[in-house]
């Protein structure tokens, strides 16, 4: 009995000792966590204080640089019909030269706040509601958060920034970042959402709206500058991309683009924020918006009638795409097409389009299946020049070609590249010739025809604008000596 009692006492002692150690560890961890949070908050508070101090003095006059015009390409090559007598003739293997390879534009993580922004508990949560492409959104802002600028002077702006930097706006920032995640917003979409929120809350295109938008954008981790001109405040957005047809300012080697500004001369605050990141114009996934179906449209391949689909587009998504600015990277206008081609189609449109195409290509070889998809893009759509329809060059995201009544060679190539990657799982290149855009597919089966050799892999030419042409046929009179190969994800 004494032995059993001794064991029980020992077990209780060990248990108490273990609990004490656990409590000691938990207390140490909580103390460390609170210290880390305080250091983060102190760092962000210090950064905002220094920024406000700079706003009282660090303004310089800048002249905008002239806008970059959209590139004047060679006259577009019209769609050419493939000789029907040659339709079933085999095409021999013919290597094609090219001049340049445009590398893949890899996506990067989106910017994030310079320090974690702590939730501020409130006795009652009040929300401001607004719409973004007809999609309801809400953030924690109420009447007490509204502010008015008495003028557009440095001290007034600095004082307003100091007020915004108080903890009372923390929940609004957190809500905006939550909306970015929930609605799958790219950087461009997030900027548009912040503008819509600020305009709805403080008045469209007011100085107050511009300052709130700039503050939310900056605190989310993005690089921006503030500009003043004719008693108006403007948000200038730093971008990795060179945006066409927009004046811009160059500050410390970075290009800044105006948001709703036509001024040629501005006083610009050169103050920077820690770890700020420029805007990316990559659209890695479609935004999640309330769906507004358009009228239906029947699309059908000429040679493969079973490749037929009835599709309705989403008007809100199409409206979002229409806001997207055309741009390039590294002064290379060929980079722009990959931005469109690498954007996936929405799950909604895939469910309408893909089952019919999958059923038609089921059981076929890669060559046969690619011919079905190629003929679908060649013959289900009406060709027209951008100059005639849009008054200038206008590339489409793949989904836009399913909505608009006309498309050209670049739109067809972007759409075909998307279909092949999604339905066949094969790698695709875009091939730019002066005045024309086509594709080339890396088959894992043995497929013959005109091809491009890259990294010991064979990419067979597929031209969605060479009407009726099979896989492997290059449109006549293409200058491969000046061809540029554009890699896709």
Question: PLM features: what roles do these ranges have?
Answer:
Residues 143-145, 150-193, 338-404, 465:
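Secondary-structure boundary elements
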Residues 20-23:
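Boundary of Sec targeting at the N-terminus
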Residues 200-213, 222, 384-438, 442-444:
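Active-site neighborhood of thiol-dependent amide/isopeptide-bond enzymes
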Residues 224-253, 361-364, 411-489:
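Hydrophobic/aromatic-rich core segments of domains that either
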Residues 196-198, 208, 212-214, 218-358:
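Extended, non-transmembrane interaction/recognition domains
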């Amino acid at each position: 009995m004494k032995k059993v009692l001794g064991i029980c006492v020992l077990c209780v002692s060990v248990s108490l000792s273990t609990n004490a150690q656990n409590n000691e560890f938990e207390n140490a961890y909580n103390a460390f966590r609170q210290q880390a949070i305080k250091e983060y908050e102190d760092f962000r508070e210090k950064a905002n204080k220094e920024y406000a101090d700079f706003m009282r003095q660090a303004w310089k006059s800048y002249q905008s640089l002239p806008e970059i015009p959209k590139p004047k390409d060679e006259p577009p090559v019209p769609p050419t019909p493939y000789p029907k007598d040659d339709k079933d003739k085999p095409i021999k293997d013919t290597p094609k030269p090219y001049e340049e390879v445009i590398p893949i534009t890899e996506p990067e993580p989106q910017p994030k706040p310079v320090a974690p922004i702590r939730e501020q508990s409130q006795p009652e949560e009040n929300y401001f509601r607004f719409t973004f492409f007809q999609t309801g959104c809400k953030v924690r802002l109420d009447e007490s958060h509204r502010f008015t600028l008495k003028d557009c002077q440095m001290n007034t702006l600095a004082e307003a920034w100091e007020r915004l930097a108080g903890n009372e706006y923390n929940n609004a920032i957190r809500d905006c970042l939550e909306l970015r995640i929930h609605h799958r917003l790219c950087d461009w979409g997030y900027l548009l959402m912040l503008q819509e929120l600020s305009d709805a809350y403080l008045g469209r295109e007011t100085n107050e709206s511009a300052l709130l938008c700039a503050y939310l954008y900056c605190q989310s981790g993005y690089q921006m500058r503030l500009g003043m001109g004719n008693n108006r405040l403007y948000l200038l957005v730093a971008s990795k991309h060179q945006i066409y047809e927009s004046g811009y300012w160059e500050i410390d080697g970075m290009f800044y683009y105006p948001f709703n500004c036509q001024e040629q001369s501005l006083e610009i605050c050169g103050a920077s924020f820690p770890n700020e990141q420029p805007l990316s114009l990559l659209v890695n996934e479609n935004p999640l918006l309330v769906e507004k179906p358009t009228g239906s449209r029947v699309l059908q391949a000429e040679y493969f009638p079973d490749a037929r689909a009835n599709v309705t587009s989403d008007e809100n998504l199409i409206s979002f795409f229409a806001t997207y600015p055309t741009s390039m990277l590294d002064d290379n206008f060929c980079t722009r097409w990959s931005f469109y081609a690498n954007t996936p189609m929405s799950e909604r449109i895939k469910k309408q389009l893909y089952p019919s195409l999958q059923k038609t290509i089921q059981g076929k070889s890669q060559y046969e299946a690619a011919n079905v998809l190629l003929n679908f893009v060649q013959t289900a759509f009406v060709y027209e020049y951008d100059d005639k329809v849009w008054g200038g060059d206008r590339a489409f995201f793949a989904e836009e070609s399913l909505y608009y009544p006309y498309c050209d060679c670049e739109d067809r190539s972007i759409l075909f590249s998307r279909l092949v990657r999604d339905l066949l799982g094969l790698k695709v290149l875009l091939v730019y010739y002066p005045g024309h855009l086509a594709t080339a597919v890396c088959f894992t089966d043995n497929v013959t025809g005109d091809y491009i050799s890259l990294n010991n892999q064979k990419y067979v030419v597929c031209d969605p604008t060479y009407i009726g042409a099979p896989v492997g046929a290059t449109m006549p009179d293409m200058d491969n000596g000046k061809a540029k190969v554009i890699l896709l994800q």
